[in-house]
């Protein structure tokens, strides 16, 4: 995790206040929520405690593919996490924190009952259209 802390410090100009490991996902990448105190700037009028996501991968090509695709999708107006910084070796990166609720969790009630609500259906359709 030390390379991730160095990348965060280079990007933000400060050390993180706190880092929490996020539960494992289906990939070999490890995700961390990095908490820090933001400073007020012209493009960021709010300041205070905020967070970003730090990612440490095991495959440089996979990491660079993901960050490249994220930047491309963002340039096309697709709502994806913004990539803030990538390490020189491509093994870790920092991206926007979009919150704690995943699509899997958002449709859990419908998935478990076999009866999706209108809200869950709309969310799934929106996601499929974006793909």
Can you say where each PLM-predicted feature lies in the sequence?
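ATP-binding pocket architecture of kinase catalytic cores
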Residues: 34-131
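Alpha-helical protein-protein interaction elements
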Residues: 3, 23-24, 58, 85
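Short, well-ordered alpha-helical scaffold segments within catalytic/effector domains
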Residues: 2-5, 28, 63, 67
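Localized chelating/binding microdomains
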Residues: 1, 29-30, 79-81
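Juxta-kinase regulatory segment immediately upstream of eukaryotic protein kinase catalytic domains
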Residues: 1-20
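ATP-binding glycine-rich phosphate-binding loop
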Residues: 14-36
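Generic structural signal for beta-strand residues in well-ordered domains
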Residues: 12, 24, 45-47
